[in-house]
Design a protein with these regions (language model features):
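Extracellular beta-strand/beta-solenoid scaffold signature
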Residues: 112-121, 141-148, 170-183, 201-209, ...
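N-terminal segments that cap or nucleate solenoid repeat domains
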Residues: 53, 109-170, 495, 502-505
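All-beta strand scaffolds that present successive hydrophobic residues in beta-strands
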Residues: 129-134, 153-159, 189-194, 215-220, ...
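Low-complexity, acidic Ser/Thr/Pro-rich repeat tracts that form intrinsically disordered stalk/linker regions
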Residues: 24-129, 133
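Surface-exposed loop/turn positions within long extracellular repeat scaffolds
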Residues: 457-463, 471-483, 496-497
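Gram-negative bacterial Sec-dependent N-terminal signal peptides
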Residues: 1-25
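Fold-core signature of tandem repeat domains
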Residues: 137, 197, 209, 216-225, ...
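Post-signal peptide N-terminal segment of secreted/secretory-pathway proteins
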Residues: 156-208, 216-225
């Protein structure tokens, strides 16, 4: 059947002239034989097969088709497989570079110091919570605390702490408590009752608290220091101390009874007595917040108190006494360092039912700072010839700002207060005086040219007198403005306002 079909096709091709010359058939190379039977003979496209393979003879084609070895080269059929390319030679392995020699290890760093502040050493150090009663601690070495309490909560009753030996660094003693008899530091808490603390070395503070979170309580304590730059009680870096029913004395030069040093702190006293008898040894020297309730604070040879930068003193039923013997005859000085002038914040001084005593000079000197002074039902005793308030610039010699640009700026509030004394300002300074709550002020206001010829301040003296309060003039006065709801007794004197208005009876 297949043979008859093939024969018929060949005849049809011959009749249409599709057959090729014999010479072309002889010149063509024979087709390669299939490696294996790829498809059965059924379904072969004979016309296509003959057109692709006319170089073969009819018997050859017929025989190949019948045996299934003739290659079907129709477009629908798969093309012969191409030979696989010869595998590429494997690349020679790259030589690994020789490893670099390892560097010698760096020397191990020195162990970190236990504290960043230089506080020196300690003869005895307590680092565990507990009660330590009836103990005795002493040190006679330089830069050494007799007792140090670090990061521990302790109580102690009836202890004795003595210290001799000078500091090698007055700065470290002041800022960090180096060489203090008692140092509580780095968050330690110490409650000491009936304790006796004494020191004889320079820079040997009696009791010192350092750093935020540190707290010292002294109850019925006796603290004394005799060396120079040896405060009675002191805190810094936001530490806190409370002194109750205690006595604190210092006799050395520049040894205040109460001191708050760098970056402030809080020091509270109740019914305690503080005395500083050395030269330039203030009763209070503060860069923090001091509250004195009851008791006395006395400086025998200098100012009663110095308030530096943004800090405060509050007196409640207490006595603050000074006896200035130096070039600045004032009892309470409020100032700022040159780099602190203009910093946001206000110094504070408040006296409630208190007594302020100045044995030489006026009571308040305000320069190079902004402050608020509140006097309520307190008694002021001073040299009658000196102003009660002197609010002026300064020559810069003490480092209190630049001359001509370091005026004082004060808000003064009198509440239930009887005050006698004049007020002196210069043209780069100002006062805002508020007389209220049935207060009576007897005195005058004088505005003098700034000695360094600084640019005048926009206002110099603004006075407000509330209903029920009184101003008794003792001399002609110059002010910027007046708001009066109370009473003014001119006593034959005048008040001249900044706009030229002259007020008189």
């Amino acid at each position: 059947m297949k043979s008859n079909k093939l024969t018929s096709l060949l005849c049809a091709l011959a009749l249409t002239g599709a057959a090729l010359p014999l010479s072309m058939a002889e010149a063509a190379e024979p087709a390669p034989a299939a490696a294996a039977q790829e498809a059965p003979a059924e379904g072969v496209n004979y016309t296509d097969a003959l057109m692709k393979g006319l170089s073969l003879t009819l018997p050859d084609v017929q025989s190949a088709v019948e045996s299934g070895t003739f290659k079907n080269l129709s477009p629908e059929a798969p093309k012969p497989a191409e030979p696989e390319p010869a595998p590429l030679p494997e690349p020679e392995p790259e030589l690994e570079p020789e490893p670099e020699p390892e560097p010698e290890p760096a020397p191990a760093p020195a162990p970190a110091a236990k504290y960043t502040a230089d506080q020196g050493s300690a003869a005895a150090e307590i680092g565990s919570d507990g009660a330590y009663d009836g103990m005795t601690y002493s040190s006679d070495k330089a830069d050494e605390n007799a007792l140090r309490v670090s990061m521990a909560y302790i109580t102690a009753k009836g202890d004795t702490i003595t210290k001799s030996g000078d500091t090698s660094s007055a700065e470290n003693s002041d800022l960090y408590g180096m060489n203090a008899a008692l140092l509580v530091t780095h968050g330690g808490h110490g409650a000491f009752t009936d304790v006796k603390i004494s020191s004889t070395g320079n820079g040997a503070t009696g009791a010192y608290g350092y750093s935020k979170g540190t707290y010292i309580n002294l109850t019925n304590a006796q603290v004394s220091t005799t060396g120079a730059q040896a405060s009675g009680v002191e805190v810094s870096q936001r530490a806190m101390m409370k002194v109750e029913a205690s006595t604190v004395t210092t006799t050395g030069d520049q040894s205040p009874a109460i001191r708050i040093s760098q970056n402030g702190g809080i020091l509270l006293t109740e019914n305690s007595d503080f005395t500083a008898s050395g030269a330039n040894a203030h009763g209070i020297y503060t860069q923090g917040d001091v509250t004195v309730t009851g008791g006395t604070v006395k400086a025998e040879k200098t100012k009663a108190a110095v308030i530096k930068n943004i800090s405060s003193i509050t007196l409640d039923g207490a006595t603050l006494e000074g006896n200035e013997t130096g070039a600045l005859p004032y009892n309470i000085v409020m100032y700022s360092d040159a780099d602190a002038i203009g910093v946001t914040g206000t110094q504070q001084f408040e006296a409630n039912h208190a007594s302020l005593i100045s044995h030489k000079g006026g009571m308040f000197y305000v320069t190079g700072t902004h402050c608020r002074i509140t006097l309520k039902d307190s008694t002021l005793t001073q040299d009658e010839a000196a102003p009660v308030f002197t609010i002026t610039g300064n020559d810069g010699g003490y480092g209190w700002g630049d001359a001509g640009a370091n005026g004082g700026h004060a808000e003064v509030i009198l509440s239930q207060q009887i005050l006698n004394g004049d007020i002196l300002l210069d043209t780069i300074s100002d006062i805002n005086l508020n007389i209220k709550d049935q207060s009576i002020w007897t005195g005058a206001i004088t505005i003098a040219p700034n000695a360094q010829e600084g640019a005048p301040y926009k206002t110099n003296a603004d006075v407000f007198i509330a209903e029920g309060s009184t101003w008794n003039l003792t001399a002609d006065s110059q002010i910027t403005s007046l708001f009066n709801l109370g009473t003014i007794h001119y006593n034959g004197h005048t008040i001249t306002l900044a706009d030229g208005t002259v007020m008189k009876e």
